[in-house]
Amino acid sequence: MKWLLTLFIALSALCSCDRKDLQVKDYSFDTTYSMVDTICWKDERIALQLSIDNYNAEEELKLQYRINGSIEDTLVINGQKTLEPVTFDPHIDKSMTMHYSPKQKGANVICLTLSNSHFSRQDYITVRAKEEVTYDYKYNGYEIHITTIEGV
């Protein structure tokens, strides 16, 4: 009977304690990404321009950009070659430019992943020569615009 009284006291204390420390911070803020894919077919080079506006998060975003399921070994980000996912701070880096040469001619499937510890968004884009496509979607308070434009 004593254990029952102890259990009752413990449950009462648990229910009456202030749970403000367990509140989850709202990360559904208004953020706009303007993303332009410029496809240059003469030299088979693709350029990605990623611009971020109104970014209020407290941490960096990680950008992964893959073609046909693999990271290109010729991926150049802001003038530097890299094989790792790109991490950047949108408060400082308002834009990022990537250039790389796809190993496969014709249609290329591009997998784009934007993520931090609070969200992750992944999309697959099929890009073909002489084609212009725009993708618009909202996710967790984010507005993300992706436009593919044929290179000149």
Which role does the model predict for each range below?
Residues 94, 106-110:
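Exposed beta-strand face motif in extracellular beta-rich ectodomains
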Residues 13-16:
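C-terminal motif of bacterial Sec signal peptides marking the signal peptidase cleavage site
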Residues 19-76, 80-81, 130-144, 149-151:
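Acidic/polar, low-complexity intrinsically disordered N-terminal segments immediately downstream
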Residues 1-4:
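Positively charged n-region of N-terminal signal peptides that target proteins for export
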Residues 114-118:
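Surface-exposed loop/turn motifs at beta-strand-loop junctions within extracellular Ig-like
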Residues 121-131:
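C-terminal edge beta-strand
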